[in-house]
Regions:
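Short domain-boundary/entry signatures in modular proteins, especially
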Residues: 250-255, 423-427
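Beta-propeller blade termini and top-face loops
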Residues: 1-254, 262-267, 275, 282, ...
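Generic signature of intrinsically disordered, low-complexity, basic-rich segments
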Residues: 169, 277, 289-292, 304, ...
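Short boundary motifs at domain starts and secondary-structure transition points
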Residues: 256-260, 466-467
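Cofactor-/ligand-binding subdomain signature composed of acidic, glycine-rich
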Residues: 272
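Extracellular and organelle-lumenal recognition/adhesion modules and their flexible linkers in secreted
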Residues: 420-553
Length: 553
């Protein structure tokens, strides 16, 4: 059968839920009276089976999920997408579909050391990709720790690597080539994980045929094969009896397993250098309801190491994470702890208040900000949350970042009605024309005329009080015949930002069928211009609001 299609990779999560992946076979069932139907991605369920959630949608069969030491979720797929980042839980979109994961690999290629490989698609790239374990112990070089991810490529007879690096609010993955590769055509790594000893353990399926399709026929393979019950073609070369397990040892590694016999030992193990033992200690404390650890756990959350993260989630699992401890974690110097403290917030009013009070919605660390935005999107829908998201969307740093923007859109960020909010600084140079240049025109302003330049067209600084709205000067453009003329100044506009342009206009005997006197952004034409003032009019304020979609000047 196609093992990529079904559920796999079950593991204990930072949040005390069980995580796993599933392929195209999907899950279509009911849990605690609620129906679910999902496939090809990452899901989680409570250990007691009372709830299940689909979190990250990938684009094909999924057979790999892994966590870095901050609890961020990554995964791999079978076909040409070896590393995904789960930037947002799919739950923030409600019943709608939105981006919850993205392939971050710089290249899906892999690098065999033999030409004798068998692939049916995605040639010379990961197809049948498996696993996504990080180097999360001292059993690896320091510059690999929490960065290097291992993805198996059995159709290339290799175990590959990617270097996972932070990028804006998310991550990128740089192809780091092969960690293990073989010329043995049966060598087929299908999973690699960091073991209890801190070393990398690798399972070799040791099989000549990896992929289930296509089915051979006489014209292509010399014989007509038949498909079995799992839709894979029947072949005597499929081996069901042999396999090998390798352990790859870093020579400078000397970490020892912790003692877990009593509560103090379990609390100490939350700070062990191997993520395996940190999660194991957390699970044992929660499953065995070790409430005698609560005081020590609260003390540990005030630290900034990895132990603080697991202490936080242990308290959460014991229903002992009080507001004081939680609020302190939200402002801890450790960005990784702040991220997890945000994830641990519930969606009720007290926790929503903590979210707003923490200032994490404006956190300098964009990855922290993403989790804060994600939590905002998870709160019950309200006008206040939508207004907050709309305000946050006006910040270019948020609007330009794909994950931050997606989270705010999921919250309901809308075009901001700027009336009633404090506006930013005036970006126009010499906006009141108070400074006059050597050419007797407003400094930093230039004439632009598209009509024929007749002698009757005149641009000047007006100083007579009856023709000045405020200050000492105004700009006067006059002519006896029709013209298309203006003065302009250069202003840099940022992408994803909303702008307001306003001013005061007075006209005398402005006739004709043209647009009249107005303000506008030439490059945006009708999308950014005020209404025109015609005929004879006393001072009237004109204003327009517009959204700029790309950087321009």
């Amino acid at each position: 059968g196609d093992t990529h299609a079904g559920p796999s990779n079950l593991r204990y999560g930072f949040d005390n839920w069980i995580y796993g992946t599933v392929g195209y076979s999907r899950f279509n069932g009911e849990v605690n009276g609620k129906k679910h139907n999902f496939g090809m991605g990452v899901f989680r369920f409570k250990p007691d089976g009372s709830d299940i959630e689909f979190l990250h949608q990938f684009n094909n069969n999924t057979w790999g999920v892994g966590f870095n030491e901050a609890g961020d979720v990554f995964g791999s797929t079978a076909n040409n997408n070896p590393t995904f980042f789960g930037g947002l839980p799919a739950t923030v979109y409600g019943k709608e579909r939105g981006k919850s994961a993205k392939m971050i690999a710089s290249s899906p290629r892999f690098y065999p050391i033999t030409p004798n490989i068998r692939q049916v698609d995605a040639f010379n790239a990961y197809t049948a990709g498996c696993g996504h374990a990080f180097a999360t112990s001292s059993g690896f070089p320091k510059n690999w720790r929490n960065r290097r991810a291992f993805i198996c490529g059995p159709t290339g007879n290799l175990l590959g690597m990617y270097d996972i690096q932070g990028k804006d609010s998310g991550y990128e993955a740089v192809n780091a080539f092969s960690f293990v590769a073989s010329a043995d055509e049966w060598f087929s790594p299908i999973v690699a994980e960091v073991g209890p000893d801190g070393n990398l353990w690798m399972a070799d399926w040791y099989n000549f045929i990896i992929q289930h399709n296509p089915t051979p026929n006489k014209g292509r393979a010399g014989y007509d094969a038949k498909n079995g019950r799992g839709n894979a073609h029947i072949n005597p070369n499929r081996d069901r009896q042999h396999g090998r397990i390798y352990r790859i040892i870093y020579q400078n590694h000397n970490s020892k397993a912790p003692k877990l016999g009593n509560t103090p030992q379990l609390v100490r193990a939350l700070s062990h250098d191997n993520l395996f033992w940190r999660q194991t200690a957390q699970r044992l404390l929660v499953d065995n309801k070790r409430t005698d650890a609560i005081d020590a756990l609260k003390t540990l959350t005030t630290k900034s190491g990895h132990g603080a993260i697991h202490a936080l989630w242990t308290l959460k699992g014991l229903n002992a994470l009080d507001q004081k401890t939680h609020a302190a974690a939200l402002i801890n110097p450790s960005a990784e702890l702040r991220r997890n403290a945000l994830r641990a917030l519930d969606t009720g009013k007290p926790d929503a208040t903590m979210l707003y009070d923490s200032a994490n919605l404006a956190d300098k660390d964009l990855q922290v900000r993403l989790v804060a935005f994600s939590k905002l999107a998870s709160l019950p829908e309200s006008d206040d949350h939508k207004k907050t998201a709309s305000l946050l969307m006006q910040q270019p740093e948020n609007a330009k970042d794909e994950w931050l923007r997606a989270a705010l859109q999921a919250t309901g960020a809308a075009e901001l009605n700027i009336v009633g909010y404090k506006r930013g600084p005036n970006l126009l140079p010499n906006a009141s024309f108070e400074e006059v240049g050597d050419n007797q025109l407003p400094a930093n302003w230039t004439i632009r005329t598209y009509s024929r330049r007749n002698p009757d067209l005149n641009h000047a600084v007006e100083t007579r009080k009856e023709f000045v709205k405020s200050g000492k000067n105004s700009l006067r453009i006059s002519a006896d015949t029709r013209h298309d003329s203006s003065l302009f100044a250069r202003v840099r506009l940022k992408a994803g930002r909303k702008y307001v342009m306003s001013g005061w206009v007075r006209t005398e005997n402005l006739e004709g069928t043209g647009n009249g006197a107005l303000l506008g952004v030439h490059e945006l034409q009708h999308a950014a211009k005020t209404k025109g003032v015609k005929k004879t009019s006393n001072w009237v304020k004109v204003e327009t609001e517009f959204k700029n979609e790309q950087e321009r000047e």
